[in-house]
Curated annotation (Swiss-Prot):
It comes from Dictyostelium discoideum (Social amoeba). SUPFAM superfamilies: Trimeric LpxA-like enzymes. Residues 179-198 are annotated as: Disordered. Keywords: Cytoplasm, Cytoskeleton. InterPro entries: DCTN5 (IPR047125), Trimer_LpxA-like_sf (IPR011004). Residues 189-198 have a biased composition (Low complexity). Residues 179-188 have a biased composition (Polar residues). Belongs to the dynactin subunits 5/6 family. Dynactin subunit 5 subfamily. One of its GO terms (cellular component) is dynactin complex. This is Dynactin subunit 5. Member of the pointed-end complex of the dynactin shoulder complex. Its main location: cytoplasm. It is found in: Cytoplasm, Cytoskeleton.
Length: 198
């Protein structure tokens, strides 16, 4: 699947050795507890609360603008306990979401402005429609489509959704490119060699 290139200012992103692209205007709290497994995109305004518990985000996953990734919590003997949060491979999270799920499987699509409440479990290959609010402790089965406020089951999804999501997130990653003179419609000029004298 091919998507239109989307260009970003290279100076505004950090690119790691394993291909993660992290916006400098995102906030990664407790960075030692945050693991990005490669070719993951963290866009501007994203907040990842690794200071509360460990957060693992799989390969070729995309966290869109102004989304909050926050580990689940539960009161235990009068105090709030936070649990590690796992997000699988090929997951696309839309803009303006709050994600407090205990776990999200692979090949999952979450639309814009969704709230995935505490301790929710999203299995592989599911879709959460825009503006959906999943109540706490919701379990979304694989190959299902949920929407609404509160979010409820709407229909089953075909088996091909797995391959579609893999191809879609891969294309989004590959088309997320740093700005160049050519991408801005400017003529490219050869770089002049600079020499120094000692």
């Amino acid at each position: 699947m091919q998507v239109q290139p989307k260009y970003f200012e290279k100076s505004q992103y950090i690119e790691t050795l394993n291909g993660n692209k992290v916006s400098k205007s995102s906030i990664l709290c407790g960075i030692m507890n945050i693991r990005l497994h490669g070719k993951t995109i963290i866009k501007p305004g994203v907040i990842v609360r690794g200071d509360l518990a460990s957060v693992n985000i799989g390969r070729l996953s995309i966290i869109s603008e102004n989304t909050v990734i926050r580990p689940s919590s539960k009161k235990f003997k009068g105090s709030l306990v936070y649990f590690p949060q796992n997000i699988g491979d090929h997951v696309l999270v839309g803009e303006g979401c709050v994600i407090s799920a205990a776990s999200i499987g692979s090949n999952v699509y979450i639309g814009n402005n969704c709230i995935i409440s505490k301790r929710c479990i999203l299995k592989d290959c599911c879709i959460i429609a825009d503006n959906t609010i999943l109540p706490p402790d919701t379990v979304v089965p694989p190959f299902t489509y949920y929407s609404g406020t509160p979010g409820v089951y709407k229909e089953d999804l075909p088996d091909c959704i797995e391959q579609f999501q893999k191809e879609y997130t891969t294309s989004l990653y590959e088309s997320f490119l740093p700005n160049t003179p050519a991408s801005k419609g400017l003529p490219s000029t050869p770089t002049k060699l600079q020499t120094t004298t000692t």
